[in-house]
């Protein structure tokens, strides 16, 4: 099967479907025919750390994956923050500390651990993700074996 490559869309198209793409108004104007070896190399998994781009000559090429933008780093930090909060809440809920505290049954080491975990949650809430990737994440309390 023969393929064409479009630098504009950074995509391959089967040449035998040109009529269908043309009728749909989606056949690229910059289509260049590529041999099977080029198609196989650039339609599969990219080498580690690379992405497919449109080369200067209109053919596909490999390029380094660009570093994440600041906005992407912030989004990743927000996700991590929420995951850490969820993990802490799950752990605390598994111990039923809130219920025990409400009825006065939380004492001693359990009370101390509960307060450490509440402090940890407070510290997580205060994390400013806008400074990503330079974030000092709070350390969770040591988990006490029971």
UniProtKB/Swiss-Prot annotation:
Q: Return any one Pfam family short name.
A: Caudo_TAP
Q: Which gene encodes it?
A: yfdK
Q: What is this protein called?
A: Uncharacterized protein YfdK
- Give the similarity note: To E.coli YmfS.
Q: Per the UniProt entry, what are the Gene Ontology biological process annotations, in alphabetical order?
A: response to oxidative stress
The species is Escherichia coli (strain K12)
User: Which region is the signal sequence?
Assistant: none
